[in-house]
C-alpha cells in the first residue's frame, strides 16, 4: 500500500497555516473546483503555483486573482501569450512543458501538490513530487496506471504521501480509516454507467460525440467523460486501486450504480461493507484531500436520502463496454501493457472527440494495440515515455492520421 497520511498520526504539516499549494491542471475541471474550495477557505491556503497547459486565457485570469509566484504552460507560444495577458507589474516565473511542470511539483515553497493534469501528461510532475517528499493530492490516475511501481518506491524512499482525489478512491480511503488493512477482503468501485447505460452494441454503433459527452451525473472534462461512457475510466481506476491499496486485480470489484450517490465500498473479512455516500460533486473529495485531517464545508448541496430515493446496483455490461476487461487484461499481463492501454485509449478518445472514428472503434483500437505489443517492459520513466510515444505513433498510423498528441 502506498504510504498514506493516515499512517502518520501527527504529520508536521498538519498545523501549517496556510497550506502552500501547487495546482497543476488548474484550468481543468478538477483544478477549477479546487480553486473554488480555496476561495471558500482563503485563510487555510496560499497558492504558490498554477499550471494550465493550453487554456492560457483562463490561467491568466486565475493568476490575476491568486498572484502565485509560478505559472506553467505547454509551450513557448503559450508563455508569450500569458505574459501579455498578465496585469502590469506582476511578473511570475513561467515554466514550460512537462519538465516545467515537474519543476513546479518540486518547489520548496509548495508543500502540497495537486496533480490534476489530464492523461499521461501528468506523469512527470507526479513522479517528481513523489521523489521530493510532497503531499500529493492525486487526481491524475494515469500516473499510477503507467508507473505505479516506480511512484510507490519513490514514496517509500522520500516520505511522500498520496491522497486520492478520484471520488471512488477517496471514498475507499475514507472507508479504510481506523481499520487494519489486513482485515480488508475486497474493494468495490461504483460506476455510473455513463450516458449509454443499458444500450446494446447495436445501439452504440450510431452514437455521436455529443451524445457521449452528456454525462448524467458528473461535470467533468471531455476526455474523462468519454472514458466514463466506454467504462475505460473504471478500468483505469481498477488498476489505480491495485497500486494504491496493495490489492490484487481480482480483489477489486465494479458495480454500476446509476445514481452516483454511493461512491465506493470496502468489504471486510467479517462480511460487513462500509460505503461512502455523498452528492456527486468533486469538491467533496478535493476539500477532503486539501484539508486532511480536518474537514471543512465543501460548498456542495447536502445529500437527502429521502429525496434521492432508491439506490440501485447492477453488473457492468462487458459485451457492450469491453474497455473495463481490456484494462484488467493489461494489468494482469503486465510487460508494459498498461502503458500501451493508456496510450491507445488517449489516441482513440482524441480521434473520437474530433469525429474521426466511431464510438465502438475506441475499444477495437485499444484491443489491437494490446495484441500488437511486443512485450517491451519499461523500467524507468524514460522507458515508459518511449513506449507511450511508440504506441501513439502506431495507433495514429493504423488509423490513417498524423500523431498530434503525446505526453506533453
From Swiss-Prot:
Cross-referenced PANTHER family, in alphabetical order?
1-DEOXY-D-XYLULOSE 5-PHOSPHATE REDUCTOISOMERASE, 1-DEOXY-D-XYLULOSE 5-PHOSPHATE REDUCTOISOMERASE, CHLOROPLASTIC
Task: Give the UniProt keywords, A-Z.
Answer: Isoprene biosynthesis, Manganese, Metal-binding, NADP, Oxidoreductase
List residues binding Mn(2+): 166, 168, 237
Signal peptide coordinates = none
| Source organism of the structure | Nitratidesulfovibrio vulgaris (strain DP4)
Report whether Manganese shows up as a keyword of the record: yes
Which reaction equations make up its catalytic activity? Answer: 2-C-methyl-D-erythritol 4-phosphate + NADP(+) = 1-deoxy-D-xylulose 5-phosphate + NADPH + H(+)
Annotated residues that bind 1-deoxy-D-xylulose 5-phosphate are located at: 141, 167-168, 192, 215, 228, 233-234, 237
This chain belongs to the protein called 1-deoxy-D-xylulose 5-phosphate reductoisomerase
Protein task: Catalyzes the NADPH-dependent rearrangement and reduction of 1-deoxy-D-xylulose-5-phosphate (DXP) to 2-C-methyl-D-erythritol 4-phosphate (MEP).
List residues binding NADPH.
27-30, 53-55, 140, 142, 221
